[in-house]
Amino acid sequence: YRQCRDLVAPYLDGCHLMDALSDYAFAEKGIVSNPVAAVQHLQPFLDAGVSPLWCYYSGAHGCRDYTGRNLSMPSARTRMIGVQMYLAGIDGFLHWGYNFWHTKFSYDTVDPFLSGDCGGFNPSGDCFLVYPGENGTAMESLRLHAMRGAMEDIRMLELYESFFGRERTEAMVLEIAGGTLNFREYPTEERFFRDLTARVMTDCAGK
């Protein structure tokens, strides 16, 4: 990997060299300057204070405790990635599989209305967030709305932080979550987001 990187790096001066990782060694040795860690492998990156640090969750589908966007998951579990990213100080999210309506390696196409798992490639829902509509348009899924909610949650918490500071914001989130919220342990019910939004609106009303 290092040899391949060194081969092309001189031609990419000034560009961001990013890659999706599961092994911290690539960041530790400086082979990848902008690592994008899978959520189930994030902890070593967080412990080392890697910055900038992005995350993604495709590939975490075999890890039942982690968030994702599988059809079998409640929307609250999909949406949770935003609050998790805020608390962990993650800089960005790698989003793949917007409209991947193919089998593994794209050998064939699939009908996403009939095959949510892309011919057995990944768990249903992992490979796409939209469905084909008329005249080349995209039909949004509920999972896409949940992902938008996740990004809006980050903006909401950043606004709260601008009024009350980081420490109080984190304490408020953890209080509503029942004391614990990380990438492996987190609320999975919609009520958490209703309570969180209500608290933010109430506290910020006079600002």
Stretches with model-predicted labels:
Residues Y1-S106:
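Catalytic-core regions of glycoside hydrolase
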Residues R2-D23, I90, S106-K207:
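Catalytic domains of carbohydrate-active enzymes that cleave complex glycans
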